[in-house]
Amino acid sequence: MLTYDQFRYAFANAVDEAEAKRLYDTFPVPGSGVPLFQAAFANLNPSTEAQVDSKNPARGPMKLISGEKDHTVPWAIANASFKRQRRNKSVTEIEEIGDRGHSLVIDSGWEEAARVAKSFVDRFVFP
């Protein structure tokens, strides 16, 4: 399990100290690091479980949402994923939410990320 300082840096760097402590007490769970390493090295080992077929014709619309201050998946990584996925014939979009970190869907500003996601989904579910 991450220490509080690790969690604060990786997930809760864009919120104040009190909220970071609340998030740490509420959300972290111990788990294996194996999936993270598989994802990190997926391009070096294409047979890993994390392999993604970016040209899969059955893939639906995709919206990548990134936090401007995200230390865990910074813009460069999110944008690289977007560039790979946009080769797909289905709609692929990316949006960066300003002044937000990796906790953007669980912290006090979650509504903004939810609005971005909902407006994207509504375009395809309720056209």
Predicted regions and their residues:
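Helix-rich cap/lid subdomain of alpha/beta-hydrolase
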Residues: 1-30, 34-41
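Alpha-helical elements of Rossmann-like donor-binding domains used by nucleotide-donor carbohydrate transfer enzymes
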Residues: 6, 22, 80, 112, ...
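Short gly/ser/thr-rich secondary-structure transition/capping motifs
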Residues: 40-48
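The feature captures the conserved acid-bearing segment of alpha/beta-hydrolase catalytic domains
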Residues: 48-58
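Short beta-strand/loop motif that positions the catalytic acidic residue
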Residues: 57-58, 64-66, 70
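Short, well-ordered coil/turn elements that cap or connect secondary structure elements
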Residues: 57-59, 87-89
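Conserved alpha/beta-hydrolase "acid-adjacent" motif
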Residues: 71-80
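Catalytic active-site module of serine/aspartate enzymes centered on a nucleophile-bearing elbow/loop
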Residues: 88-127
